[in-house]
């Protein structure tokens, strides 16, 4: 038997080694798995698979080399597009209350680092949206959300959108931001750890004086109950064990932070928190594009100075603390 020339052997070796192994999806057509840098993420549409429940679009799984356990509760998700609201209509049944979850949604892999969710005009508010997730070295998920209102259905002139992240922890339920009660006060680190679901559950920007308005009798929700403190910079972080989970946004004002100590359950032992946010787009016009960019950071916690540095490097803004 003839031996292959050395250069041919090297060529075969290079071709074999350079060939990427195909990712086996948890639910083909409904999930996109991306492993890059230090993190692994599974993005999902509204379809049920395995232990993962239907309606929980977003990031179904997120782990880090330093902690391979899912940061999110296994049956649900993080960065889950949960509510569309206008302050006027009160929703029932659940299919309307959780409109982005209940309406059809598709997912596709854009590249080896990017997945995109698409939802056609929804049943009640006729809002079409695209959510693009890109995994960036070494420990980031960049999120870009775009939406277009296809009809004049938001009765009070603004578009309200809400995202939930269900954290897999029973301790350290609060998260932290830099803020103050008034602009005359000194900035400080503040923890939001609301006493119960829908009580003192959201945080506004310190210069945000616009009131979206809710019709009289509108039930209490996470997005219409506020704590006294306001945030000074559009980022917050929480901790699970040795890990830090951080969200930062490109623009202060339209984004408001939200929190639930129990993810909607009654207060009690064994409950797990939700570290949420919502966006408000005022004076909307049918057919116009609206959106935002955000970055999720997931890595071992180093210090609060390191958290600030992450935000400064990404935003280009200098954080000033006393």
How would you label these PLM feature ranges?
Residues 2-9:
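Sec-dependent signal peptide recognition
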Residues 22-37, 208-322:
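Beta-strand-rich recognition/accessory modules
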Residues 52-116:
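An extended acidic
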Residues 87-140, 147, 152-154:
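Extended, loop-rich substrate-binding clefts of extracytoplasmic carbohydrate-active enzymes
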Residues 140-194, 304:
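Acidic (Asp/Glu-rich), glycine- and aromatic
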